[in-house]
Structures are given as C-alpha cells and as structure tokens.
Design a protein with these regions (language model features):
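Major-groove DNA-contacting interfaces characterized by cationic-aromatic clusters
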Residues: 49-96
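Short, basic (Lys/Arg/His-rich) helix/loop patches that form interaction surfaces
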Residues: 73-78, 88-130, 137, 149
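Basic, Lys/Arg- and aromatic-enriched nucleic-acid-binding interface segment
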Residues: 1-15
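Intrinsically disordered, low-complexity basic tails/linkers immediately adjacent to helix-turn-helix/homeobox/MYB/SANT
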Residues: 159-161
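Residue-level marker of regulatory loop/turn positions in helix-turn-helix DNA-binding domains and
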Residues: 7, 59, 83, 107-108, ...
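The alpha-helix within a helix-turn-helix
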Residues: 8, 19, 129
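Conserved tyrosine-mediated DNA breakage-rejoining catalytic core shared by Y-recombinases
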Residues: 11, 16, 20-61, 69
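Catalytic-site neighborhood detector that most strongly recognizes the C-terminal catalytic loop/helix
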Residues: 132-157
Length: 161
C-alpha cells in the first residue's frame, strides 16, 4: 500500500493510470524514476507522457525507494495489479487509520493532494500541469486557490507568534 500511495501522490496520478503501469513503463535513473503513462483521461489518442519522480532525501517517504523494493518483491507485469476501485479503498483505509474521515478521501485524493501540496510549496501552474497532465489551467487553479487559503491567510502573522 505504501508504494502505491507514495508513487500515486508523488506523480499526481489518476487511479486508472496507477493500475495500468507495467514494468516496461518504469525506468530507474540516477535522479529517481521515470514512469511512462501510455494513456489517460486527458490523452485519449494514446500519445502518452512521462512523469519524473525524483528520489527523496528521507528514505521512509521516498517513492523511488519504495517502488524499487515493491518491484523486487512482486514480479507481476502490472506494477500495482489491482482495480482502480481498490485504489480508492486503500486510500480510505489509510485515511481511517490516520484518524481522518474516510468519506472525504478516495482514489482522486492522491492527484488532488499532489496538486494542492505542490502549489502550497510554490510550484508553478505550468509545472503542476506538466506532472498531472491537466489540460485546463482553471482546474489547476482550483487546487492552487485551495492551497492559498492557508498559505496566504491573514491570521498567519498572529497564529505564528
């Protein structure tokens, strides 16, 4: 589950994209991992796109390290051999374990969480769209607006003193 969640979040994947990843779609490189997405909701022609996920400093949360270990232990051609509906169930299960309301989380939470979190840390619209494959700036701006609710909150000066 951890590999699926870390890769899904770090790549801003749709759940259908995650469960379609095969071993041939993955290339480990010095900087991290490149994952080729053959087809997605916004790419019906099947042009495909490559998502690059860098290695993280902290191994415990590194999607690249967890993916390497997962693939070494599991020899399936499909990297995550589950249905897209099971992705949602896994997210809900771990949200509940973390003490969160599982009804507020689903498979899309990985993708929306990526967009919101990277916006909070200052990623540009263009960079977020390059990773998620969004065609609409308006959709990405929704995530950024949500992130800005706290980042640019007028109470930050008071609450941090």
């Amino acid at each position: 589950d951890k590999s699926l969640i870390l890769v899904g979040f770090s790549g801003g994947f749709r759940r259908s994209e995650l469960v379609a990843i095969t071993r041939d779609d993955i290339e480990f490189v010095k900087e991290g991992v490149k994952i080729f997405v053959k087809k997605s909701k916004s790419d019906q022609s099947g042009e495909g796109m490559t998502k690059a996920i860098p290695s993280f400093k902290y191994v415990e949360f590194c999607p690249v390290d967890h993916l390497k270990h997962w693939m070494a232990e599991n020899r399936n051609d499909l990297v995550f051999p589950i249905s897209d509906k099971n992705v949602a169930l896994i997210i809900k299960k771990h949200a509940l374990r973390a003490g969160l309301d599982e009804k507020r989380y689903a498979g899309h939470s990985l993708r929306s969480g990526f967009a919101t979190t990277t916006a909070e840390y200052g990623a540009s619209e263009r960079n977020i769209m390059a990773m998620t494959g969004h065609k609409s700036v308006d959709m990405v701006r929704r995530y950024i607006k949500e992130a800005d609710l706290f980042k640019n909150n007028a109470l930050n000066k008071i609450s941090n003193e």
